[in-house]
Amino acid sequence: MKVFFILIIFSFTLATCQGHCIGSIPLPEMEDGEDVPLRTCVDTHDEKKHLIVSTWKTANSFSCECRQDGMWCCKEYVAVA
């Protein structure tokens, strides 16, 4: 039972260490007193603009996605065998 419990804890630790994601939630924009929907995201890695529902990879191994709720980037890992 002790070994099973240790394996469960190890698997949770491994799962949480595999992903490193960051997100940026855009500030609301106003135009004529009305909220303007988000049209683009600005990549904080290279300062380029990307359209909503687009995906791209950065030079420092992040896979990014621009969504209506903001920009989200996750670190890509290369498995060494």
From Swiss-Prot:
Give UniProt keywords alphabetically: Disulfide bond, Secreted, Signal
Is the keyword Translocase assigned to this protein? Answer: no
Q: State the InterPro entries in the record.
A: PSP94 (IPR008735)
- Got any disulfides in this one, which pairs? 21-74, 41-66, 64-73
Q: Which positions make up the signal peptide?
A: 1-19
The subcellular location is: Secreted
The yes or no answer to whether the keyword Translocase is present is no
> What is one term from the GO cellular component aspect held by the record?
extracellular region
Give the protein family: Belongs to the beta-microseminoprotein family.
Q: What does this protein do?
A: Shows an slight inhibitory effect toward the metalloproteinase brevilysin H6, but does not inhibit the metalloproteinases thermolysin, HR1A and HR1B.
Q: Under what name is this protein listed?
A: Small serum protein 4
Native source species: Protobothrops flavoviridis (Habu)
